[in-house]
């Protein structure tokens, strides 16, 4: 299968959409690694599966219900103890920086 290649402009568009500032070194690195990921995905999508029923076991969950622990509520620490360890709190809650300006 043909190797897929992202060009520099596509990497810069992705960086802008992700609010990232990339050095020339990172642009080159991302071009190489993302192109390899896309090529691998195209190869995986090209695999033909003749009988979906025979492949069902490949997609089944590995963990059975018996393997899971029972949910139980515990009180490992109290609110005051927790809030003493945070940089800033307000009204008994953890105050975090605003994400949207």
From Swiss-Prot:
- Which residues belong to the signal peptide in this entry? none
Keyword annotations = ATP-binding, Ligase, Nucleotide-binding, Protein biosynthesis
> Which GO terms label this protein's molecular function in UniProt?
asparaginyl-tRNA synthase (glutamine-hydrolyzing) activity; ATP binding; glutaminyl-tRNA synthase (glutamine-hydrolyzing) activity
**Which enzyme type, at the first EC level?**
ligase
Q: Which InterPro entries match?
A: Asp/Glu-ADT_sf_sub_c, GatC
Q: Which residues form a coiled coil?
A: none
The biological process GO terms on file are:
regulation of translational fidelity; translation
- Record Pfam families: GatC
- UniProt-listed Enzyme Commission number(s): 6.3.5.-
Write down the chemical reaction(s) this protein catalyses: L-glutamyl-tRNA(Gln) + L-glutamine + ATP + H2O = L-glutaminyl-tRNA(Gln) + L-glutamate + ADP + phosphate + H(+); L-aspartyl-tRNA(Asn) + L-glutamine + ATP + H2O = L-asparaginyl-tRNA(Asn) + L-glutamate + ADP + phosphate + 2 H(+)
Complexes and interactors = Heterotrimer of A, B and C subunits.
Q: What does this protein do?
A: Allows the formation of correctly charged Asn-tRNA(Asn) or Gln-tRNA(Gln) through the transamidation of misacylated Asp-tRNA(Asn) or Glu-tRNA(Gln) in organisms which lack either or both of asparaginyl-tRNA or glutaminyl-tRNA synthetases. The reaction takes place in the presence of glutamine and ATP through an activated phospho-Asp-tRNA(Asn) or phospho-Glu-tRNA(Gln).
Task: Give the UniProt family note.
Answer: Belongs to the GatC family.
Full protein name: Glutamyl-tRNA(Gln) amidotransferase subunit C
- Record gene name: gatC
């Amino acid at each position: 299968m043909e190797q897929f290649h992202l060009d520099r402009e596509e990497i810069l568009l992705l960086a802008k959409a992700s609010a990232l500032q990339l050095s020339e070194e990172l642009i080159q690195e991302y071009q190489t690694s993302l192109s390899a990921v896309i090529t691998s995905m195209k190869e995986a999508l090209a695999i033909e599966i003749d009988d979906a029923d025979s492949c069902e076991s490949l997609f089944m969950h590995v963990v059975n219900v018996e393997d899971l622990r029972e949910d139980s509520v515990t009180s490992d620490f109290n609110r005051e103890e927790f809030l003493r360890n945070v940089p800033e709190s307000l009204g008994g809650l953890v105050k975090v920086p605003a994400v949207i300006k």
